């Protein structure tokens, strides 16, 4: 074992100087190679620099070209924008002019429409007036024709009115005849009481009725106003109001109003003569008028004059 170790050591000792020499040789060779490579590498470096510079120049040229193109495009775009703005301005001005022209046209159209409406209304009014005038002319012609035909009608009416006038005259003349008949009957009854007793009760009642009718006719015709050919209903109400105001203000009534009041206030008609029965058998003919003031005065409370001075507890 010892021998083997020794041999290994000897071999290692012998091998050590050789490796050093080899390393020295290798370092020298490397230096030589590096120097030669440097000699050869110098033109390559220069070439690379030239290529880099050339590339840079190319890039600069490309950039300048791109800038020129961008400038050209910008100029074209600005020109296009200017043209578009000019066109827009021209279109706006033209549209404004058109709108300004259109606004008066619209107003003119409205005015024309209004004038047309007014003309239509005036035409309709004229047509209506023309129709109305035609109707008036027809009515006037009809009236004229009726006026030409009226004389015959007036004559007929006068013929019809003549008997009525005669009747009115006879009615105004009748009271005296009736009064004469009543006086004659009273004289006969007063002079011939025996004959009146011999007459039957039926005949007496008929005579009494005739006398009563004659008296009523005489009274009615005394107070009956004159008959007029025309009747005015609006004159009736003022007459009633005047009569009521006379009663309310306690003015003395005329004889005609008293007779009319007696005649209208009778609750039952008078059938028999005044001398046939005693006075208590007849109904009263005069009625007392009651005014609203007299009725209201009855309900006023009676109070002494010193009521204001007295204290109410």
Swiss-Prot record:
Protein name: Alpha-S1-casein
Residue ranges, annotated region (15 X 6 AA tandem repeats): 135-224
Residues with PTM Phosphoserine: 90-91, 93-96
Signal sequence range: 1-15
Localization per record: Secreted
Region spans: Disordered: 77-111
Function: Important role in the capacity of milk to transport calcium phosphate.
Low complexity composition-biased segments: 77-96
InterPro entries membership: Alpha-s1_casein, Casein, Casein_CS
Tissue: Mammary gland specific. Secreted in milk.
Family: Belongs to the alpha-casein family.
Extent of the Sequence repeats: 135-140, 141-146, 147-152, 153-158, 159-164, 165-170, 171-176, 177-182, 183-188, 189-194, 195-200, 201-206, 207-212, 213-218, 219-224
Domain of life (superkingdom): Eukaryota
PANTHER family linked to this entry: ALPHA-S1-CASEIN (PTHR10240:SF0)
Any one GO cellular component localisation term in the record: extracellular region
Keywords: Milk protein, Phosphoprotein, Repeat, Secreted, Signal
């Amino acid at each position: 074992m010892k021998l083997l170790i020794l041999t290994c050591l000897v071999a290692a000792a012998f091998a050590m100087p050789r490796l050093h020499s080899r390393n020295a040789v290798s370092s020298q060779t490397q230096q030589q190679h590096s120097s030669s490579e440097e000699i050869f590498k110098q033109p390559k470096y220069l070439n690379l620099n030239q290529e880099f510079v050339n590339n840079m120049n190319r890039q600069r040229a490309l950039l300048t070209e791109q800038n020129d193109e961008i400038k050209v495009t910008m100029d074209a775009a600005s020109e296009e924008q200017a043209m578009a703005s000019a066109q827009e301005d021209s279109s706006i001005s033209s549209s404004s002019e058109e709108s300004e022209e259109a606004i008066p046209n619209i107003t003119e159209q409205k005015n024309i429409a209004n004038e047309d409406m007014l003309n239509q209304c005036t035409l309709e009014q004229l047509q209506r007036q023309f129709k109305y005038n035609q109707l008036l002319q027809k009515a006037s012609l009809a009236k004229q024709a009726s006026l030409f035909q009226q004389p015959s009608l007036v004559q007929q009416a006068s013929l019809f009115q003549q008997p009525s006038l005669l009747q009115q005259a006879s009615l105004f003349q009748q009271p005296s005849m009736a009064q004469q008949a009543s006086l004659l009957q009273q004289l006969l009854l007063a002079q011939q009481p025996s004959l009146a007793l011999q007459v039957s009760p039926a005949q007496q009642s008929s005579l009494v009725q005739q006398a009563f009718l004659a008296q009523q006719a005489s009274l009615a015709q005394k107070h009956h106003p004159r008959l007029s050919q025309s009747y005015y209903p609006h004159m009736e109400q003022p007459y009633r109001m005047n009569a009521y105001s006379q009663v309310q203000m306690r003015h003395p009534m005329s004889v005609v109003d008293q007779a009319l009041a007696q005649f209208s206030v009778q609750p039952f008609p008078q059938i028999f003569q005044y001398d046939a029965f005693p006075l208590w058998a007849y109904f009263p003919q005069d009625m007392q008028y009651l005014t609203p003031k007299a009725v209201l005065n009855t309900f006023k409370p009676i109070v002494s004059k010193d009521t204001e001075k007295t204290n109410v507890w």
